[in-house]
Amino acid sequence: MRRLKRLVFVGALVVTASVTAAAVATTPGSNGQIAFRRWLNDETSRSALYTINPDGTGVRRIVPRLRRAHDDQPDWSPDGRLLAFSRFPDDGPAWINVVNSDGTGLRRVTPRCTRKPAPNRVPRGCEDAANVSFTPDGQHLLFTRATGRVRQFPRYEWDQIEHAAVATIAIDGTDEREILRLGRYAGDVKFPQMSPDGRFILFERHNSPLRKPRMGQAIFVMNADGTNVHRVTPWKLRGGDNPDWAPDSSRILFRSQEEADAERAQFYTVRPDGTGLTRLTNFPKKHRRVFSASFSPDGAQIVYARANDDRERGDLWLMDADGTNHRRLYAVPAADSAPDWGGLASSP
């Protein structure tokens, strides 16, 4: 099945369940390892997940790569003991995995598809599950799932899935529930993430050609039970690329111009009510492009991926939380991106 592009619109919203959460995801001063994705070929069709220490040492592959698939979207559990990620096969729907921080105990969380879906349809039981993140209690995962028929929009070079939803599931694969579902062919959601205090869920919304502004993109926030959905970033910024909560839940970190003009991308923060929009960076155009970012657990630093003017491939960089003091963390010939900064692993 051709990988579906993901768009977002919250129209004809149906609230079906709530998610409860406990403590914050990480505690101040508990900076642990950074997980990230490494592209293994120039076509960005093969990738694997790695971890690295905050000082740039200890790079290692966290889980063996499955043939004819790529692993993406790593997210640490609040206690730093587990890593959740999405696995995208070449032919078929994506699914969610969880693995121990040392690379052992790999297990599938979302259900296995028992039949091969048609190229233009994703039936129930074969939902495309991706964009995973832990809830603050460490026992559940938020993710997006897509199902239904695929509608093509040739003018926009876009394939739109019929139904898209934000859902939650226990890490043992039980208790799967929807939090919200979008209207038919209205768009799709990406990267739902619950605030560390458990009050809110952020997500990206990309309008389909059927909604205005057509192909628009912005970040939205809703209550943890799926109510009070509201936009927090201007449409013109096209904010997204795996937004991240500050450890104290006060701000949302995001990149502008996702999937639009990457050479004009900058990092911003905004409050969950949409106020306090602050630009953190002033990259010149010659920096080529930047990618998604993640707060450190103590809230003092940010890790992000950046392709310099002399390199087309991304390296991992650090900056202070106010957007200053940029320094390269690690550089290799491969392309590294999609970092997630975890806390120090606690004892069992």
Stretch-by-stretch model annotation:
Residues 1-8:
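Bacterial N-terminal signal peptides that target proteins for export
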Residues 2, 13, 21-348:
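Sequence signature of WD/YWTD-type beta-propeller architectures
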